[in-house]
Amino acid sequence: MWIANLGNRHIAFKEKLWYKTVASEIAKDIIAESTGLRVGMTYCDPAMAVHTGADIKTIKDTFEDNGVPMDCSVNNRIYYAQAIHAALAEEVSPGVPRLQILSSGCPYLIRTLPLMKFDLRPGRELAMADHKHDHACVTLSYYLISHASDERKSFTQHHLPRWMRPNFKKRY
């Protein structure tokens, strides 16, 4: 999934799904699909960086060897649900949502996002339940979690009291 970061706005504009494809081929496809775009970061599941069995290289290493540097995100379903809900609920200005999803570029995400439900097990009420079509939503949440600390500019004006202004001089 490709998401444009416009300061405090995020626009999901492109997605691609791969089935039964090796990591090196996916990396080549990502590079081809990203031609002409200024890709700043690629986020992945932390499980991609785990050595399993006798593997010398991890899946993340394979991507990086093929030209796609990756940064591991957080793997926590409670954070997934909170990140997506917060991004959909916030506005950067009146009528302009913080997160926009282009229907022409992300039809799978638009189709599967409403299918996501909360996990009803005790202690996980705020977590996103596991679902066979959760891949696009998890990808979106990896991005949102990694950008959770981005500056959020409110569209409401806050009046700064005179005594808090930098040029204010106290008189005694």
Segments from the language model and where they lie:
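Acidic, Mg2+-coordinating catalytic module of metal-dependent nucleases/exonucleases
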Residues: M128-T156
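Mg2+-dependent endonuclease catalytic cores in nucleic-acid-processing enzymes, primarily RNase H-like
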Residues: G7-E125, H131, D150, R162-Y172
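Gly/Thr-rich phosphate-binding beta-strand-loop-beta motif of the actin/hexokinase/Hsp70
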Residues: M1-L6
